[in-house]
Amino acid sequence: MTTRCPWVGEQSIYIDYHDKEWGKPEFDSQKLFEKICLEGQQAGLSWITVLKKRESYREAFHQFDPKKIAKMTALDIDACMQNSGLIRHRAKLEAIVKNAKAYLAMEKCGENFSDFIWSFVNHKPIVNDVPDLRSVPTKTEVSKALSKALKKRGFVFIGETTCYAFMQSMGLVDDHLNDCPCKTS
């Protein structure tokens, strides 16, 4: 690849993330759940910080299996607070457990998480015209609606900006620059 989106920089972990994951449509409910939880961990930080800790999160949070996470106790969160591989912010760590419970409540009511998430973009990616980084929004009416709907279902740490970053990363919107080789044609 020659011209990537300029936010990628030179770190190989970020280059791989950009080239192989970011903006690629993902429909697997558990992967979407993992990502929305990780996006919540980013609040106030840079994504690279979370990306470098992603494997530690997977280990600490049972590969993001909502059923196992929902059973985690305050003692489990105490252990997470001692784990240097995680962002040691109690409310953010507790949010993963709360979000697992909300996810399971949706499932119990017959709501498929992937179908729910993708319904906000009519089940197909929105490909935006992105001539430069200045034209990329940080939130949209759709991300506001998604945030509101998730909060109504009990999710936390999922504001409208976090939801937009989630939508970008999971391919609900394609915000690759127009001249980026990863841009949907």
Curated annotation (Swiss-Prot):
Gene Ontology terms describing biological process: base-excision repair
Enzyme class: hydrolase
Listed InterPro entries: Adenine_glyco, DNA-3mA_glycosylase, DNA_glycosylase, Tag
Record-listed E.C. numbers: 3.2.2.20
GO molecular function list: DNA-3-methyladenine glycosylase activity; metal ion binding
Keywords for this protein: DNA damage, DNA repair, Hydrolase, Metal-binding, Zinc
Catalysed conversion reaction: Hydrolysis of alkylated DNA, releasing 3-methyladenine
Matches recorded under Pfam families: Adenine_glyco
Protein name, per record: DNA-3-methyladenine glycosylase
Species annotation: Haemophilus influenzae (strain ATCC 51907 / DSM 11121 / KW20 / Rd)
